[in-house]
Amino acid sequence: MFEKLSNKQKGTLLAFIGVMIITPDALIIRSVSVETWDLLFYRSLLPGLALLVGYFVFFNHRALDDFKNIGLSGIINALLVLGANVTFVMALANTDVANALIMISLVPIIAAIFSFIFLNEKPEIITWFCSFGCLLAVIFIFYESYELNKYLGDFYGLLCAIFVGASLTVMRRSPEINFVPSYILGKLATAVLSAFFVSAFVIGTHDLLLISLMIITVGVSFVFISIAPQYISSPEVGIFFLLETSLGPLWVWLFIFEEPTQKTLIGGILIILLVFGHSYYMIKKENIDKVAL
């Protein structure tokens, strides 16, 4: 059935499933009681090992070749995955969930800018307009975070968006490469790095069960997200991260009652509207251009 879908439908379905699976991730992170680097270690190690074992079980003989064939693009992507992992957890450790996820909602705009720089995809005027609007909204949120001494977490969230946008661009640039092995290496590299800062390698049963769920929310989700750019553009994949921006704080509010501030809501709504409007316009324009050809 999947093979009968068009490339646009395949990419859209993969991106949607991937981001929907990851939406409870911030809630799980907020619910565990371990130290930040301990969380980062287990959040990377367990999904990384699970995906590694699963990949070799499912693909058997070709698995090792897939890892060997990731090339320079795969190595760069693995480093970007490492950066995104570290900055995401650091963002949630230093600011509210809503603030962190709002920063990450900038992924489509950042991906569009990177596509212009590295893929020679000339952006529309609307891209620059939306980028400027998002910049103003980010400054608005940053200013409040500075007053509340939470600006460091917002900064980590912005860095995470940059890493994810760059990763999507790398994957878009080399659609012939299977980036799932690259993602697995990125997770394992994060575990190795964070192991140097772990305070204790023993955690409670409750925390272990919650972190084990990240095999699905972090591991499986990004397998779908890693494959999606083979079928649709980076900005199109990035638009689905708005689901995480919208649903992530909702789960946290419903279960542990963490409410975003009024200024965060105002800035966040502005960013979501700008990013959604930009991505919708770009998708429609791409479809019109294809029909014209």
Predicted regions and their residues:
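C-terminal-most transmembrane helix of multi-pass membrane proteins
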Residues: 2-4, 44, 143, 242, ...
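C-terminal transmembrane-helix exit sites in multi-pass transporters
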Residues: 88, 107-129, 198, 246-266
